[in-house]
């Protein structure tokens, strides 16, 4: 699998940043650039992947088992869990293969290893893209349920949700294959960065608008009951805190990875950017952390899903 320095993990094409001239390391030393490289032990990487894998398998199983959860909203949540499951699983697979190759326990020709790496890269990239898409789809679904409540069930139907899911998966696979094939083209990397920023803006605008509507609704209820202003202010602060956490986690977990892509285009050979490239494994670990957090935010808050999950766990014993 393509490697560069300590960057040994998925998306080997991304790890193969533009080759620096021979004097780059010397230049970095001359300028006194000090690199802060956060090493991610293989055990920690595998542990994070395993936790995410178990969490998201439970979410998919619970939604599949309970027919009451076969609605458009849970369809998107289930697909988000499946995407996160693939992100974690593919990372665990490549880490395990690398460890086996390094230990000499697995013997394979270079061509076979390269083909395996390409397959894993496509799975990882497509699952990342689909994960971002389903986060956006969940935001749109919630927005429609609030602002078009009376027409929600006629607008967001299960067949339409299934078509949207199919379109997201197909587009994610196609774009990931395109990305892996043309990873060394700046335009492809910039398209991925623009896509991330578009999802971030979409989610921020929709959730802020939903928060504003919720605050207006709470203010109206307070007026009807002749309550004082502090109650409404407390609700607004709580909603703002929730929104900050939701968007903050999204940005902190995904932002560094797309910053990495941006810097590959802008300054592939600059010493400071080279220092950031050394933390590619950390950026992947943050994405896996997001896959761990997603079920806590979008799935496990549902009482119906928690009840089904409890039944599944009890039946398994």
Curated annotation (Swiss-Prot):
What is the protein name for this chain? Melanocyte-stimulating hormone receptor
Family to which this protein belongs: Belongs to the G-protein coupled receptor 1 family.
Q: Which residues lie on this side of the membrane: Cytoplasmic?
A: 64-72, 141-163, 212-240, 301-317
| Gene designation | MC1R
GO annotations under biological process?
adenylate cyclase-activating G protein-coupled receptor signaling pathway
Q: What does this protein do?
A: Receptor for MSH (alpha, beta and gamma) and ACTH. The activity of this receptor is mediated by G proteins which activate adenylate cyclase. Mediates melanogenesis, the production of eumelanin (black/brown) and phaeomelanin (red/yellow), via regulation of cAMP signaling in melanocytes.
Ranges that cross the membrane: 38-63, 73-93, 119-140, 164-183, 192-211, 241-266, 280-300
Please give the subunit comment from the record. Interacts with MGRN1, but does not undergo MGRN1-mediated ubiquitination; this interaction competes with GNAS-binding and thus inhibits agonist-induced cAMP production. Interacts with OPN3; the interaction results in a decrease in MC1R-mediated cAMP signaling and ultimately a decrease in melanin production in melanocytes.
Q: Which residue stretches are annotated as topological domain Extracellular?
A: 1-37, 94-118, 184-191, 267-279
Q: Which GO terms describe its molecular function?
A: melanocyte-stimulating hormone receptor activity
- Annotated Gene Ontology cellular component terms: plasma membrane
């Amino acid at each position: 699998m393509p490697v560069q320095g300590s960057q040994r993990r998925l998306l080997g094409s991304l790890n193969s940043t533009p080759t620096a001239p021979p004097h780059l390391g010397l230049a970095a030393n001359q300028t006194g650039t000090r690199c802060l490289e956060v090493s991610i032990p293989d055990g920690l990487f595998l542990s994070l992947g395993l936790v995410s894998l178990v969490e998201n398998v439970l979410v998919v199983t619970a939604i599949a088992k309970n027919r009451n959860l076969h609605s458009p909203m849970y369809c998107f949540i289930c697909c988000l869990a499946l995407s996160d499951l693939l992100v974690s699983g593919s990372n665990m697979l490549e880490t395990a293969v690398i460890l086996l190759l390094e230990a000499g326990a697995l013997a394979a020709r270079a061509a076979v290893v390269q083909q395996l790496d390409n397959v894993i890269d496509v799975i990882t990239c497509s699952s990342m893209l689909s994960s971002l898409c389903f986060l956006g789809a969940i935001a749109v679904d919630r927005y429609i349920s609030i602002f078009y409540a009376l027409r929600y069930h006629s607008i967001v139907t299960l067949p339409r949700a299934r078509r949207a899911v199919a379109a997201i998966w197909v587009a994610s696979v196609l774009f990931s294959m395109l990305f892996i094939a043309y990873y060394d083209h700046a335009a492809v990397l910039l398209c991925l960065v623009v896509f991330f920023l578009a999802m971030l803006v979409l989610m921020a605008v929709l959730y802020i608008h939903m928060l504003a509507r919720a605050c207006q609704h709470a203010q109206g209820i307070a007026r009807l009951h002749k309550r004082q202003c502090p109650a409404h202010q407390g609700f607004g602060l709580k909603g703002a805190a929730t929104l900050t956490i939701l968007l903050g986690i999204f940005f902190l977990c995904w932002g560094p990875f797309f910053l990495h892509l941006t810097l590959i285009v802008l300054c592939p050979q600059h010493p400071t950017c080279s220092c950031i490239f050394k933390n590619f494994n950390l950026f992947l670990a943050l994405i896996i952390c997001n896959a761990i957090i997603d079920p806590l935010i979008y799935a496990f808050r549902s009482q119906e899903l928690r009840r089904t999950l409890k039944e599944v766990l009890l039946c398994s014993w």
